[in-house]
C-alpha cells in the first residue's frame, strides 16, 4: 500500500518486486494473485529496468525469494547496500489491512484455508493441530490474523531483520501520511548528499 502511494506521489520511483512476481513473498502470498515463473519475473523486471528511474529507487524489503522467483543478483546486491527504512503500525491496523487484502473476495478463502495446516505444523503440530483452521471456519478472522502475526510472521520478520540498521523509523498507520513523510525524508537525504558532494 505504501509503495503504491509513493509511486503515485513520485511516478517512476518504485520497483514493485511483489507486483512483478504476482506474490506477496510469504506462505500465503499467492492468495488472490497470479504468481509467475522465473522467466516471466525476469522479463518483467528487465522491462521495468529499461524504463529507468527518474529519481531514487524505492523497493519494499524482501527476502531473496519472492514466491518461486529469485531476485536477480544485481538488484539484490543493490538492495543489500541500500539505505534501510523501517515502517511500523499498530496490531489492529495491520489486522484490518490484511483482512481487506487477503479476504477481499470469497474466491480467496479456500486457497488461504488450504495453507493453514502447514503453518500449524510450523507452530507446533501437537498444540496447534486444527486450531487455525477452526478459527477460520468459525469466522474468527481477526483472532486468526493476530495469531499469525504474533506467532508466525513477526518472529520470521524479526529474524530476517537481525543485523540490519535502519536510518529512520516511520509510523505506517496512515498510508497517505507516511508516504509523504518517506518522500520528504528521501528528498532531504538526497539534497544533503548533493550539498556534501559540492563542498
Model-based region annotation:
Residues 9-79:
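Conserved nucleotide-sensing/catalytic segment adjacent to the nucleotide-binding pocket
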Residues 1-10:
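Glycine-rich phosphate-binding P-loop
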Residues 59, 86-87:
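Short hydrophobic-aromatic micro-motifs
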Residues 78-82, 88-199:
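Conserved NTP phosphate-binding and transfer environment spanning the P-loop NTPase/kinase superfamily
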Residues 34-38, 84, 139:
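Hydrophobic alpha-helical scaffolding
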Amino acid at each position: 500500500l505504501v509503495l503504491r502511494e509513493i509511486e503515485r506521489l513520485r511516478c517512476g520511483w518504485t520497483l514493485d518486486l511483489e507486483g512483478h512476481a504476482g506474490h506477496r513473498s510469504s506462505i500465503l502470498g499467492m492468495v488472490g494473485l497470479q504468481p509467475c515463473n522465473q522467466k516471466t519475473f525476469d522479463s518483467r523486471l528487465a522491462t521495468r529496468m529499461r524504463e529507468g528511474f527518474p529519481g531514487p529507487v524505492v523497493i519494499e524489503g524482501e527476502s531473496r525469494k519472492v514466491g518461486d522467483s529469485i531476485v536477480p543478483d544485481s538488484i539484490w546486491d543493490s538492495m543489500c547496500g541500500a539505505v534501510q527504512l523501517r515502517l511500523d503500525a499498530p496490531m489492529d491496523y495491520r489486522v484490518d489491512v490484511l483482512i481487506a487484502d487477503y479476504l477481499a473476495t470469497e474466491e480467496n478463502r479456500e486457497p488461504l484455508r488450504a495453507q493453514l495446516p502447514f503453518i500449524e505444523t510450523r507452530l507446533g503440530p501437537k498444540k496447534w493441530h486444527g486450531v487455525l483452521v477452526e478459527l477460520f471456519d468459525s469466522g474468527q478472522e481477526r483472532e486468526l490474523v493476530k495469531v499469525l502475526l504474533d506467532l508466525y510472521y513477526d518472529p520470521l520478520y524479526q529474524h530476517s531483520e537481525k543485523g540490519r540498521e535502519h536510518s529512520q523509523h516511520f509510523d505506517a498507520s496512515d498510508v497517505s501520511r507516511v508516504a509523504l513523510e518517506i518522500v520528504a525524508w528521501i528528498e532531504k537525504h538526497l539534497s544533503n548528499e548533493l550539498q556534501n558532494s559540492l563542498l
